[in-house]
Swiss-Prot record:
Enzyme Commission code: 4.2.1.41
Keywords, sorted A to Z: Lyase
NCBIfam families the UniProt entry points to: KdgD (TIGR03249), PRK03620.1 (NF002958)
Family of this protein: Belongs to the DapA family.
Protein's UniProt keywords contain Lyase: yes
Protein name: Probable 5-dehydro-4-deoxyglucarate dehydratase
MF terms (GO), sorted A to Z: 4-hydroxy-tetrahydrodipicolinate synthase activity; 5-dehydro-4-deoxyglucarate dehydratase activity
Example GO biological process: D-glucarate catabolic process
Record's keyword annotation contains DNA damage: no
Pfam family membership, one: DHDPS
Catalytic activity: 5-dehydro-4-deoxy-D-glucarate + H(+) = 2,5-dioxopentanoate + CO2 + H2O
Pathway note: Carbohydrate acid metabolism; D-glucarate degradation; 2,5-dioxopentanoate from D-glucarate: step 2/2
Length: 312
């Protein structure tokens, strides 16, 4: 059972940086390596985060079976031991999303990230109906992820918020500033707003002015102190420091990430390897970084080694 009401869940996730951990796979057979995953979560918890997305996009939800997803979520719940909320994924079709929600409740998760339906183009009315059915199937607080083929405007979101009191979060992966402005202007503090564009640090400062107080940080996986320092600078509107850190690490990191489609996940696992916390390979259809690219990433990480004190 969740320790948070939907309202409490929303308040908690909006209070700080959100962790987006990768899922560990064994190199021998690509099976879930639960022991390594839990050990890594224990290390991550030594750094302050407001919530944890288990088996999310960076956690390769798209390549996990329902049974594997349940194992990952249960491992996260067990390892966190109530210290921070665990946000479980739901996605694919409506019926499957509902089953994911039921499994998340049974596992003791604290909230749901509702990912877009798989390979389905639908009208906004259809997407809204999907979201409503999923929200009404669970008592947990739900964050709807606006991206790809699941894009809702302020009118649909307002109706959903009226009908579904547990729809308490909005994660933006679209990057349409006009739409984001309209949504926040209409709904205000009815939602907690989460930045969800790839390498969310890039957009964190302008998004903060539109009510987006937090984001899921993939780089928190391997440069957690840098990620937290960056987040603190954003929240303080320390523009000079934010842009210094963008130039020092984030923007060169994005250039490397953009080398190939799918590297948004692969580069995070490469980062783990660079700091000596190998999480295994990515699953197909993703591909791992080349040795040369890993060397480039290692040189980049060394720029912030003083902040990280990686040897400590």
């Amino acid at each position: 059972m969740s320790r948070y009401s939907p309202k409490e869940f929303a308040q908690q996730i909006g209070s700080g940086l959100l962790s987006f951990p990768i899922t560990h796979f064994k190199a021998s057979d690509l099976s879930f390596d639960e022991a390594a995953y839990r050990a890594n979560l224990s290390w991550l918890f030594s750094h302050e985060a407001a919530g944890l997305f288990a088996a999310g996009g960076t956690g390769e939800f798209f390549s996990l079976t329902a049974a594997e997803t349940d194992r990952v979520v249960r491992a996260a719940v067990a390892e966190t031991a109530g210290k921070i909320p665990v946000i479980a994924p739901a996605g694919r079709g409506t019926a499957e999303s509902i089953e994911y929600c039921k499994a998340a409740e049974a596992a003791g998760a604290d909230g749901i990230l509702l990912l877009p339906p798989y390979l389905t183009e639908a009208s906004a009315d259809g997407v809204a109906a999907h979201v409503e059915q999923v929200c009404k199937s669970t008592k947990l607080g739900v964050i709807v992820y606006n991206r790809a083929n699941q894009v809702l405007d302020e009118n649909h979101l307002e109706r959903l918020a009226d009908r579904c009191p547990n729809l308490v979060g909005f994660k933006d992966g679209v990057g349409d500033l006009e739409l984001m402005t309209r949504i926040y202007a209409r709904l205000g503090d009815r939602f907690t707003y989460v930045g969800g564009l790839p390498t969310a640090e890039t957009f964190a400062l302008p998004y903060l002015t539109m009510g987006v107080t937090t984001y899921s940080s993939a780089i928190f996986n391997f440069v957690p102190k840098f990620a937290l320092e960056f987040y603190a600078a954003v929240r303080a509107f320390d523009n000079a420091k934010v842009y210094k850190m963008l130039n020092e690490f984030v923007l060169p990191y994005i250039q490397l990430r953009n080398r190939k489609r799918g590297y948004a996940v692969s580069i995070v696992k490469a980062g783990m390897k660079v700091i000596g916390r190998d999480a295994g390979p990515v699953r197909a259809p993703l591909t791992d970084l080349t040795d040369a690219e890993i060397a480039e990433l290692s040189a980049l990480v060394s720029r912030v080694a003083e902040v990280e004190k990686l040897a400590a």
